[in-house]
């Protein structure tokens, strides 16, 4: 059963799922789609053409789906935000809608955990199981692969791609692409090691060992792209292939490796 506070504003055309809770002074715009068992807390604003998946939580004063901070944007353009299931969007987070430079939509996968004061700009593409710590800031068109963690107070430059399973340390600043399964740190960020904590949670020991050997082959000597080409030959690990293809396809370049002894 829906629970909607009398002071909440629900615009005509909004589609609300079963068991939705909308608290005092919240706003839900026209043409929104709110899934089942979604809670929109006091003062949160869900703007037009936003979709939020089942079992999600939008906390007080978060703003989802407002127009992009892009001077070329025209308000008559169709744009919005699509968020998957089980999302947590904490207080004062802002998620802007997309632009015609993308497909019109900012997209976030399932199980996102977006902490307070984070900003996700227009046309960002976030995979599943993403964590953004407080005040992480993503500029336009940033892409984050599945299982990526971005530490607090970290800005990411527009068009940067962060591969699957990465960890970006807090108070870093990214301006180049980060290879899957790596840990990056610093201002400007460099690649420091494998994200061993993350890959040990997901993969068995044999796969962790394969990724460790691949990391050493790629980063510790010679030319990075040549190393990636050579490593792809007769490569059986799909995860190692992801690392190699990412390196070969980067457009913003890969930051330098400044290693840690535990890589």
Swiss-Prot record:
Gene name of the record: lpxA
Keyword Phosphoprotein tagged: no
Annotated EC: 2.3.1.129
Record-linked PANTHER family: ACYL-[ACYL-CARRIER-PROTEIN]--UDP-N-ACETYLGLUCOSAMINE O-ACYLTRANSFERASE (PTHR43480), ACYL-[ACYL-CARRIER-PROTEIN]--UDP-N-ACETYLGLUCOSAMINE O-ACYLTRANSFERASE, MITOCHONDRIAL-RELATED (PTHR43480:SF1)
Organism of origin: Campylobacter jejuni subsp. jejuni serotype O:6 (strain 81116 / NCTC 11828)
Reaction it catalyzes: a (3R)-hydroxyacyl-[ACP] + UDP-N-acetyl-alpha-D-glucosamine = a UDP-3-O-[(3R)-3-hydroxyacyl]-N-acetyl-alpha-D-glucosamine + holo-[ACP]
Listed InterPro entries: Acetyltransf_C, Acetyltransf_C_sf, Hexapep, Hexapep_transf_CS, Lipid_A_LpxA, Trimer_LpxA-like_sf
GO terms classed as biological process: lipid A biosynthetic process
Family of this protein: Belongs to the transferase hexapeptide repeat family. LpxA subfamily.
Gene Ontology annotations for the cellular component aspect, listed alphabetically: cytoplasm; membrane
Pathway: Glycolipid biosynthesis; lipid IV(A) biosynthesis; lipid IV(A) from (3R)-3-hydroxytetradecanoyl-[acyl-carrier-protein] and UDP-N-acetyl-alpha-D-glucosamine: step 1/6
Role, per record: Involved in the biosynthesis of lipid A, a phosphorylated glycolipid that anchors the lipopolysaccharide to the outer membrane of the cell.
Keywords, comma-separated and alphabetical: Acyltransferase, Cytoplasm, Lipid A biosynthesis, Lipid biosynthesis, Lipid metabolism, Repeat, Transferase
Compartments, record wording: Cytoplasm
GO molecular function: acyl-[acyl-carrier-protein]-UDP-N-acetylglucosamine O-acyltransferase activity
Subunit annotation: Homotrimer.
4Fe-4S found in the keyword field: no
NCBIfam families in alphabetical order: lipid_A_lpxA, PRK05289.1
Protein name: Acyl-[acyl-carrier-protein]--UDP-N-acetylglucosamine O-acyltransferase
């Amino acid at each position: 059963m829906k629970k909607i506070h009398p002071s909440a504003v629900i615009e005509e055309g909004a589609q609300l799922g079963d068991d939705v809770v909308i608290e005092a002074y919240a706003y839900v715009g026209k043409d929104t789609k709110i899934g089942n068992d979604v809670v929109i807390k006091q003062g949160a604003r869900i703007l037009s053409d936003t979709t939020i998946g089942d079992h999600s939580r939008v906390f007080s004063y978060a703003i989802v789906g407002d127009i992009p901070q892009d001077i070329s944007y025209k308000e008559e353009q169709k744009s919005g935000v699509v968020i998957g299931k089980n999302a947590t969007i904490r207080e004062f987070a802002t998620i802007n809608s997309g632009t015609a430079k993308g497909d019109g939509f900012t997209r976030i996968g399932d199980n996102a955990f977006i902490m307070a004061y984070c900003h996700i700009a227009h046309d960002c593409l976030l995979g599943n199981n993403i964590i953004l710590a407080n005040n992480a800031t993503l500029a336009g068109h940033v892409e984050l692969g599945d299982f990526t963690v971005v530490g607090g107070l970290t800005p990411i430059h527009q068009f940067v791609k962060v591969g699957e399973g990465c960890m970006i340390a807090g108070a870093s600043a990214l301006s180049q692409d980060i290879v899957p399964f790596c840990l990056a740190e610093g201002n400007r960020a460099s690649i420091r090691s494998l994200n061993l904590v993350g890959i040990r949670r997901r993969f068995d020991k044999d796969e962790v060992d394969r990724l460790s050997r691949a990391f050493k082959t790629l980063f510790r000597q010679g030319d990075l792209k040549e190393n990636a080409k050579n490593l792809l030959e007769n490569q059986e690990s799909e995860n190692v292939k992801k690392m190699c293809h990412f390196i070969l396809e980067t457009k913003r370049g890969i930051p330098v490796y400044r290693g840690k002894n535990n890589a």
